């Protein structure tokens, strides 16, 4: 099968990569681009461990094809940290021991960032059903 050339913006940087037509964005991030912070949990889009932002929208990377990222802006957990250190969300996760084994944590942080960008002061119901 011929590999396809894709151009995207990943964590603020223009990237060009080759991927198979049926390769998930999760596999592209991890295997082609070396961005291993995004993890696979369930592989069916139910758990959110593989959450990324695509043009600011929360997406499960396991459900998106890599070729679909062409011309889009992708943000992963690696792109969330401030240049001078941790993003405030990452700091709060650490300070409040909001961690378990670590597989889901990157996705939780990405999803939390997406929530707070849309709802800066969410109530409990908004958080619960986000």
Predicted region positions:
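Signature of N-terminal electron-transfer/Fe-S-associated modules in redox systems
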Residues: 1-130
């Amino acid at each position: 099968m011929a590999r396809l050339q894709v151009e995207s913006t990943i964590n603020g940087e223009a990237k060009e990569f080759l991927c198979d037509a049926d390769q998930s964005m999760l596999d592209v991030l991890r295997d082609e681009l070396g961005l291993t912070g995004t993890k696979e949990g369930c592989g069916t889009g139910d758990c959110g461990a593989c959450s990324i932002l695509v043009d600011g929208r929360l997406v499960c990377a396991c459900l998106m094809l890599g070729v679909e990222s062409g011309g889009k802006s992708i943000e992963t957990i690696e792109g969330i940290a401030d240049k001078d250190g941790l993003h405030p969300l990452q700091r709060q996760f650490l300070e409040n021991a909001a961690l378990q084994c670590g597989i889901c944590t990157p996705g939780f942080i990405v999803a939390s960032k997406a929530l707070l960008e849309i709802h800066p002061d969410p109530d409990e119901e908004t958080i619960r059903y986000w």
